[in-house]
Amino acid sequence: MAVSHGFNLTEATTSVSAPVQVSSGLQIIVGTAPVNQLANPAAAVNTPLYVSTYKEAVAAVGWSSDFAKYTLCEAISANFQVVGTAPIVVINVLDPANKKHITALDETSVQVNDGVAEIDKVGILLEKLVVKKDTTALTADVDYIASFNDDGTVSLALITGGAGDGATTLTVSGSILDASKVTADDIVGGVNAATGAETGLEVVRQAYPKLSKAPGILLAPRFSKNAQVCAALQAKCRKINGLFNAVCFVDLDCSADGAQKYTDVAEQKTKQTATSREAYALWLYVKVGETVYSGSSMAAAATVYNDSQNGDRPVASPSNVTIPISAACLEDGTE
């Protein structure tokens, strides 16, 4: 038998530690996610998705580290990567079937290097992607294989023997699922009078009948700085399904249009309508390293973790509880 002498090095991908499973204070989070990365994006739109691990969450709604654009990813990171709590329920409102959420990917040329071309755009809908070699349209999985990179951009790998084989440039066009097009109205949502379909915060009602889970904390990270969203969150906390009461965590606007000094917070809280007993108003964002998180995402996760330290009972205030952050900051990252 061979005997190894000296030092040996083995490298493994860093994994996310298992989160603490908490039965109280279930977070229901409404926001945006890069669902264009999924095989069936429509299945992750305006429906409550229950996730217990980081892996489940990414499989359910996709992943991006651009938290300003994809707010559900921020909440996923705050819970599973930073604080270490689970489960959560996520409701994505970014909808590939909504023309208002679509931006055209105008025809553009991309260079092919060693049989691979890179499309430097995020949000691309693969089913709408048109790829050409000169004037010849290429067929997905026959002439090329499209895949998402870690940053959400797309790689096109040409298949040997396919119609694109040997190309030095390709022409691409299609559609982009654009998170910047989501508005406060999308988050607040509503009910379609003809079909009864619910969107946005109206979907909160579905958590109990679909998942058998009672809501505890409602939040819409970053979007809740809007007074309309803030008011809707508070209204949704009362008598959910005619039975359950919840609280909501809302972000006070700390952009140039909001409160950038603590002396302006009281006025901003009133301006934003964050005045009910259900509303926990959070001023300032936070940093973990150089990554910026909204106050609502981090505080909600920390509150649930605090419950876990008290037998899953929401009996202790999360006030003055230590959380793993590097700094407090404004929305733009200014400390």
Please identify what each model-predicted range represents.
Residues 2-21, 26-45, 49-52, 62, ...:
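A glycine- and small-residue-enriched flexible loop/hinge signal that marks low-structured segments
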Residues 85-150, 176-178:
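Extended beta-strand solenoid/passenger and fiber regions
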Residues 168-176:
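Short, hydrophobic/aromatic-enriched beta-strand segments in well-ordered soluble domains
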